Amino acid sequence: MNTYTVKANDIKRDWHVIDASGRVLGEVAAEAAKYLMGKHKPMFCRNLDCGDYVVIVNAKKITVTGNKLDQKMYYRHSGFPGGFRQEKLGDLLKTKPLFVIEHAVKGMIPRNTLGAQILAKLKVYEGAEHPHASQTGVVSKES
């Protein structure tokens, strides 16, 4: 008996909708990363993009535990002298909640070219409405 190897044509992609209202940022990001990579499937293969599409709604209503709103910092640098910028998580959640969720999920995805393909299947929206409601095989996840 030979070992079954997954081919790119064998992969079937579903759509998962995750409602982030009232849920913790890390919990939502971990669930999204699991579905994006395909680790929930019995045919998981590390060298192929076998994951599903993930839609995260209500990004504005996400919560964090502890004092992270005031203490967790996000850093960036423009590359120019004096171009170092830092922002608190609380400020970013008010202005760019989509970036916060995408950044958290990106940290849980492999850092290679396959990771870029995987991350392209993530869709994040501030409100409850999203344009992917008509996709076939939409699976609603609520934890």
UniProtKB/Swiss-Prot annotation:
**Record keywords: Ribosomal protein included?**
yes
- A GO biological-process term: translation
- Disulfide cross-links: none
Q: Name one GO molecular function term.
A: mRNA binding
- InterPro entries listed in its UniProt record: Ribosomal_uL13, Ribosomal_uL13_bac-type, Ribosomal_uL13_CS, Ribosomal_uL13_sf
The UniProt record lists the keyword Cell cycle: no
Q: Which domain of life is it from?
A: Bacteria
Q: What would be one Gene Ontology cellular-component term for the protein?
A: cytosolic large ribosomal subunit
Which HAMAP family does the protein's record reference?
Ribosomal_uL13 (MF_01366)
Q: What does this protein do?
A: This protein is one of the early assembly proteins of the 50S ribosomal subunit, although it is not seen to bind rRNA by itself. It is important during the early stages of 50S assembly.
Record text on subunit structure and interactions: Part of the 50S ribosomal subunit.
Q: Give the record's family classification.
A: Belongs to the universal ribosomal protein uL13 family.
User: This protein is called what?
Assistant: Large ribosomal subunit protein uL13
Gene field? rplM
